[in-house]
Amino acid sequence: NSEYPELFGREWENYCRTDSNPELKGNLWAPDVIYNEKMGKYCMYMSVNGDDWNSVIVMLTADSIEGPYEYGGPVVYSGFDAGDKHPAELTDVYQVLGEGADLTRYQSTTNTKLNAIDPCVTYDEEGNLWMVFGSWFGGIYLLKLDEETGLRDYATTYETVPNQSDAYYGYKLAGGCSVSGEGPFIIYKDGYYYLFLSYGGLVAEGGYQIRIFRSENITGPYVDEAGNSAVYTSQENNLFTNIGVRIMGSYDWSGNRETRVAQGHNSAYVSEDGEIYMVYHSRFAEGKNGITEAHEVRVQQLFVNEAGWLVAAPYEYTGEHISKTGYDMEQMCGEYEFIIHTPTTYYQKAGKATVGIMQPSHITLNENGSVTGELTGSWTYEEGSPNMTITLDGVTYQGVFLKMPSEKLYFNQKEREVVMTFTVLGNNVTAWGSK
């Protein structure tokens, strides 16, 4: 539906619009669509962005996923205060908290001030409908929705407990204390809810990066492989942190056409046959077609290692499937480029493909189980399965082998070369190998 001034005009004109940000165009962000079984409708959740965190997430409905969509109502607001600048009376905050409630904490970026954008709506394993949302500063939160309306479930209440929950925003899942973090997304697989977050800024040198945490409950707590909480209790620059499993870093190796940087703001999908796909956008150190900030959408398959953590295929998805019965010794053995996705650095120099870029080491997986080359150690595999374990310089990584096409076409090639790869995680750090 191209009539977005009519669809979103009510919230935009009444709450989000300011003299410094007067146009709705360019202020509609990050839609998320889900089929609501109770309503029998496709529900789109859209961020309507205003200045100074003065934003609202609204819901639209349609009978077809392609639309046309109709306005359903607001779900959650941010940026409100008790004064005249962003009047709370224009929101539902007093309906939730009660008339005269103290709103002081919602104006503190180290406390609960966040931007109500970037919704992800999902069902838990018990059939309850939830929305995870938020951006930077105050953190990422989770609200229960009413399946009958697709909007906030006003019958569900929350306590205000520092670093755990807020009476208006719901359960606190991640972030806080002014750290970066946006684009939350949750999927469920084999007993765990996986929370994806993007740290940093989305420009090429902004340190954009995807981090993963998991929990046995959709409401948390979410932790990384090392047991670190996704919630921050003190202020720090989390672009250089080892908190959260960084699914991939900025990297350059022979299997890619360009140097990948600033990957982020992903969604993810678990197919009916149990395969997992991650959709995200990437920028490039060299730019693309003369555009420094050019970006493209990518899809990469994810796998669950033996410890129950997600690891990403080294190359973009082109229809290949992992061998559930594994691979033979000749396919697995040989020389590999090996990249460690160090979580504490990122690309920071336009046009220079060496600053903050992960470069490969060269290793050889030998038939006797040893690893030789620039790094040394050992490796094993699970008979009848793609699962593998590799120990290098004292760090043990677990993951899978996968035979797939690389992303680089060499001179006179019409098809990408199919190569053996592996993707692993160990000591809270991901790594890839490509033969």
Each model region followed by its residue ranges:
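Carbohydrate-active catalytic/glycan-binding domains of CAZyme proteins
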Residues: 1-435
